[in-house]
């Protein structure tokens, strides 16, 4: 320290510093006092004081607090993780719901196994009545854990993951984690039983259904493997339905169903609902599950949904007899598959399959393809008893093949016995009115084709006069040649032959049963083939036709229309064909409107109007007594008359 002499010289300064230290904060400093904020000497005196150990103490305390805080955070996170793992599959909103489940064990023990993870379904059967005070912030529950020596001890836990520690316990993070893991050391017997029961939920539900209803659920249904397969009728068994919802289910389903058959029986699980429903439209299993889940508040895992057995008489009798008893409620008209197997009149209508009825149906509807016959006739099973008998038969493929063969034979014979005038009249009767014949005439004029010469050629063409039996339409591409020819073939129901099949001996076999034919896009190679082998066909004289697996057939070639980009009369190579055909030239591109539609509509209705308008010009015969005597062609009938069956 400084000597005493120096201190005596600065005696007043010493007191000033001491006065400043004792003055209260905020007091004004007199102006006559000399105060310097940077007291260098005082700072020099401070260097004599060693305060390093005080800083070390403070830093150690801060490190300890940070370590303690991190340990507490880790312990809290671990406690929350354990609680989440324990209560992840709980159906209640808090651990207190376990006490409610044990309380209602006798009424619905399935709640111990059924865990609904949907948080929105909070109004289940075991919901506790609200006391009016609301739920407490911290909900605790007691559970028994094995203590030392195998004794059971009661522990308390809260929903925030904290443990109630004893006075002797410490607050370290490791002890908290060990306390939270105690619940994993024991597995009650009831949990093991629930796991065994829930390992096959469907088997458990089927066993309970058979115990309650006295019959197997699978005896009433035919299982669908896919959840996307659609059906109109469904048999649903729903487990654990609330009584109030079970009573109102019939009224809730009325807006979705045409027929409802509802049964409700009570067991130890609650109410089991058995439902036979015919919906207004086809639905798949997933759609029905979502509908019932929304109406009954039952998870989809505890529903059995399958379509019913439609051809089982015992199943039909079960639904019919239970509908008459007081254990079921029905709404709507009974499905026809139940009536057919239970009502006397419907039973009498079941008969053996008659092939003649199937052939008559195919002939009347002009169906000759085997695939169309099989599909469309099967659709009539719900309306036609013979179609239902067809579906029950084990020889459906044979019946379809025989029906198609006979129908084609009958159609071919019908065409052969008709003249060209009768055939055109027959085709016109099948087409609606309302056509405009001017479209065809205007299109011919647009292509610079004289209408009168074309009409004369068409008259001779339809009559099949020798040397006038073939019409050729020649022109550049995209002039509407094929469109004109195809529209005429569609109206006349003619056939189309293709030169691409000329390597086969049977490529001309469609001409055997045709009233008119079209050879589209004849190339020079095709004209060479016609010049070599088909001169008689163009003449309209009889020719010999080879058919597959059949003897040779002698026929007169039907009127043949040919379209080509090559003019056969311009080449002397085919000079022998010049006198056998009538050539018309289409020189202008086919016209379209601004929307891309054809400007001239060559439809069946317009062709009907064209033939009706030019009937006399084409020299087609007309039946004068048609109104009095009816059609000259007899109506085909292959089904013999029979007396109605009476009871």
Curated annotation (Swiss-Prot):
GO biological processes: DNA replication
Protein family per UniProt: Belongs to the papillomaviridae E1 protein family.
EC numbers, comma separated: 5.6.2.4
Post-translational modification: Phosphorylated. Sumoylated.
EC class of the enzyme, as a word: isomerase
Residue numbers carrying Phosphoserine: 90, 94, 108, 121
Renumbered residue ranges of the record's region Disordered: 89-116, 141-180, 622-647
Domain annotation SF3 helicase: ranges: 449-599
Self-association and partners: Can form hexamers. Interacts with E2 protein; this interaction increases E1 DNA binding specificity. Interacts with host DNA polymerase subunit POLA2. Interacts with host single stranded DNA-binding protein RPA1. Interacts with host TOP1; this interaction stimulates the enzymatic activity of TOP1.
The UniProt record lists the keyword Isomerase: yes
Source organism per UniProt: Human papillomavirus type 34
Keyword tags: ATP-binding, DNA replication, DNA-binding, Early protein, Helicase, Host nucleus, Hydrolase, Isomerase, Isopeptide bond, Nucleotide-binding, Phosphoprotein, Ubl conjugation
Gene3D superfamilies reported in the protein's UniProt record: 3.40.1310.10, P-loop containing nucleotide triphosphate hydrolases (3.40.50.300), Zinc finger, large T-antigen D1 domain (1.10.10.510)
Protein name: Replication protein E1
Catalytic activity reported: Couples ATP hydrolysis with the unwinding of duplex DNA by translocating in the 3'-5' direction; ATP + H2O = ADP + phosphate + H(+)
PROSITE patterns in UniProt: SF3_HELICASE_1
């Amino acid at each position: 320290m400084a000597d005493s002499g120096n201190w005596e010289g600065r005696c007043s300064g010493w007191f000033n510093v001491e006065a400043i230290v004792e003055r209260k904060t905020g007091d004004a400093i007199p102006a006559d006092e000399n105060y310097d904020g940077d007291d260098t000497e005082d700072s020099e005196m401070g260097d004599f004081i060693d305060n390093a150990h005080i800083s070390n103490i403070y830093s150690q305390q801060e490190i300890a607090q940070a370590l303690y805080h991190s340990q507490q955070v880790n312990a809290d996170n671990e406690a929350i993780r354990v609680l989440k793992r324990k209560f992840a599959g709980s159906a209640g909103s808090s651990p207190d719901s376990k006490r409610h489940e044990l309380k209602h064990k006798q009424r619905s023990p399935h709640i111990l196994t059924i865990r609904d993870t949907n948080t929105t379904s909070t109004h289940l059967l075991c919901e506790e009545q609200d006391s009016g005070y609301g739920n407490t912030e911290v909900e605790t529950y007691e559970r028994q854990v094995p203590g030392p020596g195998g004794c059971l001890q009661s522990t308390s836990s809260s929903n925030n993951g904290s443990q109630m520690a004893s006075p002797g316990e410490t607050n370290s993070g490791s002890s908290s984690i060990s306390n939270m893991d105690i619940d994993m050391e024991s597995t009650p017997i009831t949990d093991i039983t629930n796991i065994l029961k829930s390992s096959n939920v469907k088997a458990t539900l089927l066993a309970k259904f058979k115990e309650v209803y006295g019959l197997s659920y699978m005896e009433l249904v035919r299982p669908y493997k896919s959840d996307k397969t659609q059906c109109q009728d469904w048999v649903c068994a729903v487990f654990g339905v609330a009584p109030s919802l079970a009573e109102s289910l019939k009224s809730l389903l009325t807006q979705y169903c045409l027929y409802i058959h509802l049964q409700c029986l009570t067991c130890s699980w609650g109410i089991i609902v058995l439902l036979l429903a015919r919906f207004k439209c086809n639905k798949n299993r997933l759609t029905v599950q979502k509908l019932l889940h929304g109406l009954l508040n039952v998870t989809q895992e505890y529903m059995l949904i399958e379509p019913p057995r439609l051809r089982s008489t015992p199943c039909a009798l079960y639904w019919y007899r239970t509908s008459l008893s007081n254990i079921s409620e029905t709404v709507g008209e009974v499905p026809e598959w139940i009536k057919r197997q239970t009502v006397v009149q419907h039973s009498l209508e079941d008969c053996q399959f008659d092939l003649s009825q199937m052939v008559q149906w195919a002939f009347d509807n002009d169906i000759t393809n085997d695939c169309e016959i099989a599909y469309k006739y099967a659709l009539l099973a719900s309306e036609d008893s013979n179609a239902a008998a067809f579906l029950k038969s084990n020889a459906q493929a044979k019946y379809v093949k025989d029906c198609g063969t006979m129908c084609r034979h009958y159609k071919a014979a019908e065409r052969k016995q008709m003249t060209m005038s009768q055939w055109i009249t027959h085709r016109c009767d099948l087409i609606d009115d309302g056509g405009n014949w001017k479209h065809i005439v205007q299109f011919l004029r647009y292509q610079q084709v004289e209408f009168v010469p074309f009409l004369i050629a068409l008259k001779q063409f339809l009559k099949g006069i020798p040397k006038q039996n073939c019409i050729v339409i020649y022109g550049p591409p995209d002039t509407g040649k094929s469109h004109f020819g195809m529209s005429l073939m569609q109206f006349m129901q003619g056939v189309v032959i293709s030169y691409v099949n000329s390597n086969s001996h049977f490529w001309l076999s469609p001409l055997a049963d045709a009233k008119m034919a079209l050879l589209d896009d004849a190339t020079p190679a095709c004209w060479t083939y016609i010049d070599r082998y088909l001169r008689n066909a163009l003449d309209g004289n009889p020719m010999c036709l080879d058919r597959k697996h059949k003897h040779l057939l002698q026929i007169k070639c039907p009127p043949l229309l040919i379209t080509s980009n090559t003019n056969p009369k311009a080449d002397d190579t085919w000079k022998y064909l010049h006198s056998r055909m009538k050539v018309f030239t289409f020189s202008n591109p086919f016209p379209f409107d601004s929307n891309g539609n054809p400007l001239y509509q060559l439809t069946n209705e317009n062709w009907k109007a064209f033939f009706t308008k030019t009937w006399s010009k084409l020299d087609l015969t007309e039946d004068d007594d048609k109104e009095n005597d009816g059609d000259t062609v007899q109506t085909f009938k292959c089904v013999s008359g029979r007396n109605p069956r009476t009871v």
